[in-house]
Design a protein with these regions (language model features):
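Terminal connector regions
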Residues: 101-147
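Residue-level preference for beta-strand/loop junctions
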Residues: 26, 42, 59-61, 89, ...
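Sec-dependent bacterial lipoprotein signal peptides
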Residues: 1-19
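Short structured motifs
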Residues: 30-35, 48, 77-81, 104-106
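Bacterial Sec signal peptide processing site at the extreme N-terminus
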Residues: 15-36
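Post-signal-peptide N-terminal segment of Sec-exported extracytoplasmic proteins
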Residues: 35-76, 126-136
Length: 147
């Protein structure tokens, strides 16, 4: 009876070990914060700070950001620049605004002087070690000042 129980215990342990999810497949989206917005004559730069809560690094191939100022949607920013987030680390990333988004942001900031709440909804395309793509979504906020 003992060998039977031992073989059942070993089999169960192997099955449970084989069913565990690798750390990379249990990814949390990074925490994000808007740290700056600078706009001028049809140009602009949005600065975001990302904090990776995962025990594995994140390789973001590309990202899409939707910018809102106050309660107004300003526009969508597609960013093809890669972002490397070290495990449990932080990175500051700057995103160049398309001309239409920069113009809309500048018009909003001129009409609303002082500090304005900026909200950015980001979709981050992470490439896993197996070359799969996982979309991580996060929302960041911060106060920005009119020029």
């Amino acid at each position: 009876m003992r060998p039977f129980l031992l073989s059942i215990s070993v089999s169960l342990a192997l099955i449970l070990t084989g069913c565990s999810t690798p750390p990379e497949e249990r990814l949390d989206a990074p925490a994000a914060r808007v740290t700056g917005l600078v706009v001028g004559n049809d140009t602009g730069v949005l600065t975001l700070s990302f904090a990776n809560p995962n025990i594995v690094p994140l390789v973001i191939r590309s990202s899409t950001h939707t910018l809102s100022l106050g309660d107004k949607s300003i526009g969508i920013i597609d960013d093809a620049e890669a972002i490397g987030l070290p495990n449990s680390g932080r990175v500051v990333h700057t995103v160049k605004l398309p001309a239409k988004v920069a113009q809309a942001a500048q018009a909003y900031l001129r009409a609303n002087p002082g500090e304005v709440r900026a909200t950015v909804k980001s979709s981050l395309e992470h490439v896993t070690t197996g070359d799969d793509t996982v979309t991580l979504k996060c929302i960041s906020t911060g106060l920005v000042k009119a020029p």
